[in-house]
Amino acid sequence: MQQKYNIYVIIVTYNAMQWIDKCIGSLQHSTVPLQVVVIDNGSTDENTAYIRTHYPDVTLLAQTQNLGFGQGNNVGIRYALAQGATHLLLLNQDAWIEPDMVQQLLPYDDGNSLLSPIHLTGEGDRLDKNFKEHALMRAEHFEQLVDDWAVGKTHKYATYEINAACWLLPEKIIREIGGFNPMFFHYAEDINYLHRLHYHHRGVYFVPQAKAYHDRANIAQKPLNEQYMYQQMVLRMININDSWCIANARKWRFVLSILRAAIRKRQFSYLPMLSNALKCIGRITQEAKTNRYTQQQIASHWI
């Protein structure tokens, strides 16, 4: 099995010192050999110097500016494909893996599907909240999943949404679907990628026997801001599983939800942010239409 695969791990970092040893250290203990590529998005801490000193076998692609999560990953994916990667393991800077995680995933690789482990919290004592609410609870055949899990059966389970903290992607998917969409800087780019996978009838699965950890429980939740509003509207507008008419209806439904929240919570500071986000949306309507067409085509977009 180990000779058959050439797996590159892509990690995008920005001021990642608090996690870097757990993240990269876990990869060094993998039962399947992994090539590690770090794309640093212009960190202002000691991240790049530390990696160069303590992890000389890691390929470090240091950027002079913050490209964002998606475009940083695209830099790494482009590099890995040029080196002959058969698979890409996208791993968050605040995530780490069990030694046998990749080994547990590979038997379920069909060349056409995204595979993910289950995501535990950084403490490892419970499921990550996002994973539980979106991947697990939206899994197909949920009752069968519970039965299988209880008696120790091993399967993969289809679901609609898994955040990109730990994704295993075969080269074929990248060649046919492409990289992350440049219309997103940070957040929502993984949801857009899942929309594209579903549109093109590619699988999205998780394997309960494979485990990764995502340490975000202690990260303070950011307040609602203009960038979030803008990206949520873009996400709805360019979802190719919806017609243009329905996509715009979903965008306006989101706008109404913000207005209701502003009134209910008496957070009237939302209103100028929403107004500015809508102005930005008005300027990218044609770009959104063109982007939708691009996503519908089979090609290695943005790589």
Language-model-derived ranges and their functions:
Residues 98-130:
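Conserved donor NDP-sugar-binding/catalytic core segment of glycosyltransferases
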Residues 26, 40-48, 65, 95:
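A conserved acidic beta->alpha catalytic loop
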Residues 226-233, 243-303:
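Non-catalytic, C-terminal membrane-associated alpha-helical segments of glycosyltransferases
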Residues 135-159:
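Short, flexible, basic/aromatic active-site loop/helix in glycosyltransferases
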Residues 85-96:
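Short beta-strand-to-loop acidic/aromatic patch adjacent to the donor-nucleotide binding site
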Residues 63-83:
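Glycine-rich, basic loop-to-helix element that forms the pyrophosphate-binding segment
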Residues 25-34:
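Short, acidic, metal-binding catalytic loop of nucleotide-sugar glycosyltransferases
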Residues 160-178, 183-211:
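A short, conserved alpha-helix in the catalytic core of glycosyltransferases
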